[in-house]
Structures are given as C-alpha cells and as structure tokens.
Amino acid sequence: MTIMRKKHPLIKIINHSFIDLPTPSNISSWWNFGSLLGLCLIIQILTGLFLAMHYTSDTSTAFSSVAHICRDVNYGWLIRYMHANGASMFFICLFLHVGRGIYYGSYNMIETWNMGIILLFAVMATAFMGYVLPWGQMSFWGATVITNLLSAIPYIGTTLVEWIWGGFSVDKATLTRFFAFHFILPFIITALVLVHLLFLHETGSNNPAGLNSDADKIPFHPYYTIKDFLGVLILLLAFMILTLFFPDILGDPDNYTPANPLNTPPHIKPEWYFLFAYAILRSIPNKLGGVLALILSIVILAFMPLLHTSKQRTLAFRPITQTMYWILVADLLILTWIGGQPVEYPFIIIGQTASIAYFAIIVIFMPIAGMIENNILDLD
C-alpha cells in the first residue's frame, strides 16, 4: 500500500496533499476551517444536485416546485433546509477563515490569498443566484435591486442590466439563466479550490507564531486528519441543530410569499451574510459611489499585503494592532446589524460611521499601529 501511495500517479498527488504533507507542528484549530469549507462545498454540491432533480426554473412553477420538494419528495424538506442552512455554515466558515488569514498575516502568501479572494467572489455570486431560485418575494426583489445596481455603470449600465435580465425586468429568462449559473459555479469553485491548494502547497502553511517552520514539520496524517475530524464533528453538530431545530431562523419570512412584481416588500434585504456589504452600499447616497464601495469592501482584502507595515507577520505579539483588529470585527458585526434595519434615523448615521470606520481601520489605523509597534520594539 505504501509503495502504491507513493508511486501511483494519481494517488501520489493525494498523498502529497493530505497524507505526507509536511505541516507546521504548532498550527491551532483556526487552521481547521479550510477542511470545513471543503466539507461545506461537498454538502452543497450533493444537496444541490438532489434539489435540481425536482426543481423547475420557470416563473410559474419555481415556487410550487420548492413547496413540492418539501412536501412530497422523500426527505425533501431535509435536503432543502440542509442546502439553505449549508450556505450559512459555508459563509460562517469563510468569514472565520478570512479572519484567521488577516490575524496571522497569511495574506503575505500573495498567490494563495488572491486566489482566496477570487473564491470569495465566486461563492458570493453563487449564493446570490441561489437565493433567487425559490422565486419568493425577497428572491424577486433582491434580484431586481442588486442586478439593477449595474445600471450605475456609465454609458453601458442600462444595456448591461437588460442583457443580464434577458428582457426589461427580472422574469423567466433571468430565473432560467440564474439556475444554469448557480448549477455550474460550484464546479468552477471546486476547480479554483484545487488551484488555491496548489498555491498553498508551494509555500507551505503559515503558523500562529508567523515564523519559518521548516525545522519543525510533522506529517499531515494522522495528526491533522484527526484534528480536522474533530472540527468536522463540531460543524456537523451545529449544522444539524440549525437544520433540524431552527431551519428558518436565518431566512426571511417574505420568501414564503410567491414573487409578485406589483407588490414591493417593506424592507428589501439580502441573506444575513451579505448584510455588511449591503450596509456599506446603502451608506453612500450616490448610486455609483455605493456600488464602488460595495466592491471595494471585498477588493480591499487584496491590498492587505501592501498595507502590512510591521516587521512581524502575525498579530500574536502586537497588542495595538490586535485592538484594531477586534474593533474591525465589532464594526463588521455592527454593519451586519445595520444592513437588516430600515433606512431611517438613527440607522443611517450608524451605518455611515461604521462604513467609514471599516475602511479607515484597514487602510489607516492598522498600518500606523504596525509602524508604532516597530518603533516600540525597536525593529527599524
């Protein structure tokens, strides 16, 4: 078996990636989220495949087909809720994974980091299109509002929106193409994940100390396979509690009303994992400015290697930047809360303040804190 593991052309790749992979001996549970994201992706592809067998992407039957899945298909309700809440678990793991990368300076592995940002965009696009498919009120109006933002692009905006819609409004053509893209994108994401891993294995993993760990590596299996398995059990426990006891807690009640173009819901909002970006979008009164701020809220991650001023890689030994980091986390939670609130006083001013703080912390305060720490520790 050992000979086959090390010699067989295909098994050799798996061996070098998951079995004999040299791994730093001190990586903590924050490094579990990569494997958990892989698990989430597998769950989403499998549940999505079974949903696609019964779903119809037609405006007249889409809502009914989802109801049919929940009522008449064997364990259809479970598959549907696993898929819906699986997306939430996916994003929880994603945000923690990115947060870990920022905290421990993993963004200095530039190719891996940039590939991760592309993956984040791809997953967000997939989730957005998936939210449109049940064809409830929030599906329809969410699709209308978010796609309509592209009309802010000068000259080509309106034409572009009508091209995406396949007509003059969100209708049958839009739903059909969104279903097609929602189906294909997870497989593209899987390919991008392999590229992400390829880049990661070129440099090796980072570690909590941020130091070179070449002198102290251990094989991935059995040490980290068993550690990852514990993370998998905890994730599945949380996932099953969410799916079986509170399946609708993260959803919107409006989506249980069939889509009606003549009746606008009182508060149009996306799923909870987009609320922080939605709050940033709404905090700018100008349409184009809001769209740019929305895109920049994610693209700014690509500039983190350039904004790294400290001589140390991680925040483990940098209390000033640590404080800035946790203020940023709190700020993102505030933005998430604001994104779900109506556009009125005092939520408007809180959202604008939190949006300014988000960009200021990343672009101004964290780099300055890094320079101050260099001075204090005399690392110049």
Swiss-Prot record:
Keywords: Electron transport, Heme, Iron, Membrane, Metal-binding, Mitochondrion, Mitochondrion inner membrane, Respiratory chain, Transmembrane, Transmembrane helix, Transport, Ubiquinone. A ubiquinone binds at residue 201. GO terms for cellular component: mitochondrial inner membrane; respiratory chain complex III. Heme b b566 binds at residues 97, 196. It is a multi-pass membrane protein. Binds 2 heme b groups non-covalently. CDD domains: cytochrome_b_C, Cytochrome_b_N. Signal peptide: none annotated. PROSITE patterns: CYTB_CTER (PS51003), CYTB_NTER (PS51002). GO terms for molecular function: metal ion binding; ubiquinol-cytochrome-c reductase activity. The chain crosses the membrane at residues 33-53, 77-98, 113-133, 178-198, 226-246, 288-308, 320-340, 347-367. Component of the ubiquinol-cytochrome c reductase complex (complex III or cytochrome b-c1 complex) that is part of the mitochondrial respiratory chain. The b-c1 complex mediates electron transfer from ubiquinol to cytochrome c. Contributes to the generation of a proton gradient across the mitochondrial membrane that is then used for ATP synthesis. Belongs to the cytochrome b family. PANTHER family: CYTOCHROME B. This is Cytochrome b. It comes from Microtus quasiater (Jalapan pine vole). The gene is MT-CYB.
